[in-house]
């Protein structure tokens, strides 16, 4: 039996181009071979002449051959199938490799920063060039709706030792559905979605979809120029939202109208989108990604997502997306054991599996895997103009013993994942270099040093880090009965001990309103809606006055009563009727907090210790906090009463004498409070709290008041 034919039949051939197509024999003859699965007859028309009938090989009947005694320049196959269906086909095996030597070198070195332009599926020259990295495969084919999903029809060739396989197939176009059919070293067939697919079928279907390069006409040049000009010190108020449940059933195009109007009205500077990358399991909220380069197809195509982002940018709103480079699901048709062996994941399960989530962990030390992830970060920033990446579960990447009893130390015997550290540094440095003004934000729950320090100084290089300590402590405090808060006063003050150790975001995220945790509204210990609303308002005012960027999950901006559930839309009815007056008041306060946050310079000094000064951090008896925020000569005094008792004639020290104008009172009637507004403060030459000037004020229960010094 012909050895090449045998390997083609078993889908184990590394070089099908050496067999298929036209090949000179050295004696003046040329043999042409083609695989046409299911064909009844095949003829080849050479140099425009009469068709030459081809003969099926005895060892492999799907392979047809013809030998002629003249030079072959151009040719096509004329194929007839059962029932008389016929077609004229161009030969895919006439072409030179579609992945060049330089591309292969850069991929092998882990340095190809535009990987999506090389691997995957690309419409070119009247067909599609397919390529995939599968280093352990014995053979790779493309299957799709263009070849009856037959794994023998279109075998790919391996390009040297790069692990890359490729084939250009004529007459395939955008919209075609496909997978890579991989034959493993032990002969098992695996049909896999394309890791580099730029579009995927919505679940439960699992095929990849060919897309043409986008010609979307962006209109956000002004925004991108602004983004590049401002630094991390710019005020940032982030609205975190889940694409599928903000308003159920909305498309990207519909969100481009409704979401933009809503976010503008509330005064947010950014939205953070959950579930942008394609994921099959909706209850995963987008944290078990199967197609890293494909936008979520439930709400529209790639250009529809571009339209949403463009619309937000034109409205002056930045776009952050959740990005999950730490782990990926074990679905058999996706990245896991991609070519039959550990490929994207670490081969040792002590490093390659995440027991908490039942997922695989990327092999950050492998060049091609690191390249896949770094290029993916750039892909979203360049191709979709994403302004920031919120990197999920960073702690699980940094520590080899994260949530593991059985773990493998690094080469120095430590618990630090040194490969992950180097990957994060490279990713951050590359994104910041290639996409001016882009942000990277770490969800990191430990005290790892230098998360937001520059890579040039040995840090990880993130722009910002979620302040998980502030979030946990402040929520623990606020859900206590006011009568007992004085015994836990440190929970509301401790965050200022480390507030300037990193560049922080204060997050009230999706994780805090699910799985029985309740919502901001339901966490409040009060029984009446009046008191609950007052507590939510005072807490939000504390959050907006505290150093750090702001992040609030959808629904918390009005105090949604029920926990978030991704399977349904938000409870917008909370805002309706007379019962919704307190929720409308919280919404009005959120809008005003955002306006003041952006207009009062003192509130924007997030990352410099000189921007904050305690007035009184130790008044646990009365559950009152008071402090100064300052920037460029502008000073703002914040006083918050977390107790259930109105503080009459409460004296606070102030750093300067004069009139302090009230700019916020959460008890104002416009926020559905009682309207106990005392107006401006006039200082007295009486020392208090170590300051020469002071003033006396009334602070209603569960109320925050802000004052600015009149110039």
From Swiss-Prot:
It comes from Corynebacterium jeikeium (strain K411). The active site is at residues 392, 443. Pathway: Glycan biosynthesis; glycogen biosynthesis. Keywords: Carbohydrate metabolism, Glycogen biosynthesis, Glycogen metabolism, Glycosyltransferase, Transferase. Its EC number is 2.4.1.18. One of its GO terms (cellular component) is cytosol. This is 1,4-alpha-glucan branching enzyme GlgB. One of its GO terms (biological process) is glycogen biosynthetic process. The keyword Transferase applies. The keyword Glycosyltransferase applies.
